[in-house]
Amino acid sequence: MKINQLAVASTLESGDVMIRIAPLDTQDIDLQINSSIEKQFGEAIRATILEVLSRYDVRGVQLNVDDKGALDCILRARLETLLARASGIAALPWEDRQ
């Protein structure tokens, strides 16, 4: 999936996560995580984000994640919404999910 534009998903409410994405000129993934629960769940947050990016074959992006204690399912939903917005597609290809 090609990320074409800047995008933001969600708010900074308690129990939620705000994610910002921007395209890069390289194939790197620049991931910055700021979380109120980073000491306990930072690695799990990072693993979830990288797994979703890998599933949609996303490379060459900068991600800024401001987590306020979001559950894993919320993190995934926000990230998938963000990817759709940033790639300019109306909806993700749900029929391709396994």
From Swiss-Prot:
Pfam families xref list: ACP (PF06857)
Iron-sulfur as UniProt keyword: no
GO cellular component: cytoplasm
Location within or outside the cell: Cytoplasm
Record bears the keyword Cytoplasm: yes
Residues that bear O-(phosphoribosyl dephospho-coenzyme A)serine: 14
Principal location class: cytoplasm
InterPro entries referenced in this protein's UniProt entry, alphabetically: CitD, Mal_deCO2ase/Cit_lyase_ACP
Residue stretches spanning the membrane: none
Keywords for this protein: Cytoplasm, Phosphoprotein
Record-stated family: Belongs to the CitD family.
Subunit description: Oligomer with a subunit composition of (alpha,beta,gamma)6.
Alphabetized NCBIfam families for the sequence: citD, PRK13253.1
Cited HAMAP family: CitD (MF_00805)
Role: Covalent carrier of the coenzyme of citrate lyase.
Identification of the protein by name: Citrate lyase acyl carrier protein 1
Underlying gene: citD1
